[in-house]
Amino acid sequence: MISSTRAKSSRRARTSATLLLGVWIWVLIDVIIADPARGATAGEVLKKIQSLAPAQRRTALEEGAKSEGQVVIYTSVSLSDYPKILAAFEQSYPYVKTNAFRSTPSGVVRRVDTEAKAGRHAVDIVASAPVETWQLRQLQLVTPYLSPERKALFKGSFDPEGYWTAFDVTPIVLAFNTKLVSQQEAPKNYQDLLLPKWKGKMSLGTEDYEWFGALLDLMGKDKGLDYMRALAKQNLHMPGSSSVMRVQLLLGGESAIAIAARGRRVAEFKSKGAPIDFRLFDPYAAEPDMLALMQHSTHPHAAILFYDWLLSQDGQSKMSDLTGRIAVRKGVRHLPWLQELLQKDFLFMTPAAKTLGTKEITDLYHGVFGLYGTKK
């Protein structure tokens, strides 16, 4: 009996030791992945390469990226698109593995902020929406970087201080289901959305902050808020932050009109014969997706290499060809079904383009539309 008890105790001790060893192994792995002290910071790498000739600069980045072996990207780019972009990068640089976390724009910010507060800096680059990218800057988590590729980009597509650079742009349109709304009765401007006949028949996203801020700037804060409050009284459907989801619900007849829909997806569905069409309102706003280089990047060479590649002729062309996204680099050809979106100049919605602060915009948006228990 004593022998049996001792044997059981010995087995329990060995099991506990094994579990404890496993825990410590995972802790060590996490520290190794997230510890920014293992190598040069992004700022140090940028300082080192800033005076190099283009060929030498590229070689330095490639050699550093080979040593680092990976780049970690947090993004809000759609599930159908971002894997194609990352795969194209890996084809160009097979020695750099891309690891990605995908969420909503606000979800990306929450994760980066939570990890930073815990002292874990896993992310190298964030590719997300303007308001959320600006929030990361305000949290002092972004390091300024002016890519040499910026010289070939459209005016207004990068921050002069280097805290963000757009890599694509999505025009904002009013989409409507052509089985439910005829071409003749479809709204022609924002005031038409306040007509009683559209009450309960329209949708809006829960995080359309950039569109909201652009209209407040155009109308003026007071008049803009009056308009938005009137719009909120139209019993809008607000199923979530995804424009793609709202367009799919529109096609299914859940709503007749989608306000602030992303034009690229709408134009794509239209080109495939879906019962959908769109209007280009004034202001014809367009929302960019932005790159931000993280201050505590643990793979800075690979991060800068990815940043430059996505803005390059090769990266922008492959992004456009593979996903249909609208490039911000001059001279890139776009798919035929996008041409209708490109026939009119659009207002580039960036953090610097708005007079209101990002927190004020998000707070007002939540309050006006009664989101998250708020109402103003």
Language-model features and meaning:
Residues I85, Y227-A230, T298-L310, K318-M319:
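Short amphipathic alpha-helical coupling segments at ligand-binding clamshell hinges
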Residues K155-G156, V169-T170, W198-E207, M228-K233, H237-G240, L310-R333, ...:
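Periplasmic-binding protein-like
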Residues H334-K376:
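Extracellular/periplasmic bilobal clamshell ligand-binding domains
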